[in-house]
Structure formats: C-alpha cells, structure tokens
Curated annotation (Swiss-Prot):
The keyword ATP-binding applies. Gene3D superfamilies: P-loop containing nucleotide triphosphate hydrolases. It comes from the Bacteria. This is Thymidine kinase. Belongs to the thymidine kinase family. Homotetramer. It holds the Pfam family TK. Its EC number is 2.7.1.21. It catalyses: thymidine + ATP = dTMP + ADP + H(+). It comes from Xanthomonas euvesicatoria pv. vesicatoria (strain 85-10) (Xanthomonas campestris pv. vesicatoria). Signal peptide: none annotated. Keywords: ATP-binding, Cytoplasm, DNA synthesis, Kinase, Nucleotide-binding, Transferase.
Amino acid sequence: MAKLYFYYSAMNAGKTTTLLQSAHNYRERGMRTLILTPKLDHRAGSGVVASRIGLRADGRIFERDTELQQLVERDIHNDGALHCVLVDEAQFLGRAQVWQLSEVVDRLRIPVLCYGLRTDFRGELFEGSQFLLAWADELEEIKTICHSGSKATMTVRVDAHGHAVQDGPQVEIGGNERYVSVSRAEFKKIMRGEGRIDPLQIALPLPVA
C-alpha cells in the first residue's frame, strides 16, 4: 500500500544522501522515480539535488504555486508508469502542496517520500513540515549529533563570529557556513547569547587516503 513518508532532521544529518540512496534502490530494480526539488534551493545548480558526500541527481523543480498532483500526472502521461516520488527540502512545501502529495498517494497509489527540516532557526515549524507531521502516514527522524555529544534536534543560524542570528527571514539558503545542528539545551544556551559555535565543519567529500 502506498504511503506518505516524512523523514525529518536538523541540518547536516544526511537527508539528501538518504533520498538519493532511496532513488537509486528503486532504479536498481527497474522502477522509475521522480525527484522534486524547490526552485529556491539552487546551491548545486538549478534542478540538481546534491548531497554533502558528493552524490547528485537531476530533479524536477517546483515553486510555491506548483500543483504537484498535476505535475506528477503529467510526468506519468509523458514518461509512463511511476513507482515513487521523492521530495528534497520538503520543509519548503506549502500546505496545499502537502495535501496534493497525499492525493498522489491516495488516488494514484504512488508512494511519496519527503525529506526536510522539522524546525527553522527560531525553533519553529516550517509550513511544509507542520503539515507533513500532521498528515504523513509514516514519520522517521534522521539523527545527527550536536558538538556537545547529545542528539541534535534544533538548527541555529550563526553569523561569521559563531553567534546566533535571531532575526531575519525564515528561508535563507545556506549550508554549513550559516547553520549548525545542536541539541535543545545548546540551542537555548546560544540563543541566550552564552558562548558561540564554530560554524566550520570538515569539507565533504573527504579525500581518499
């Protein structure tokens, strides 16, 4: 039975790597997939989904007003049977788009796998994540680690000096240089202005020894 899945985490937990591995697993079995990626995230190039460890694949761009059920139906009409839809950066979906993806599952009987952040740099839910948490059939946390050694569940936006940024737009595309995953306790600490966090992390992919 097809289901709507939401795989969520803080930053740098390997969400896109997991998405690309899932897509590969389908293709390896002769099944066709469709990867959707938001237009506003063009860090790897327009329509390219890329992980920090060097994996990449082409995706279909969507915008806030894209009708996703219709997009999927057109894809099937043009290219034939579709076995799975995968959505990168799913936190950027709108409420209506999450509902449309649920229709892909319920009406078209195609599983939809969404990968994204749960909360923003203020600790508040993104719109897409809010409704995926409400409507998905299956929820799974992709875990990552805070510098303190605890599980990281929050994401902090930092400035060049490692201090928390508490103002600004919810959506601001950036990678390791702007965002750091931390535990809830560390999130509270840095948001109070107690200390700083080094935003620099080891560059990936790592060189082969």
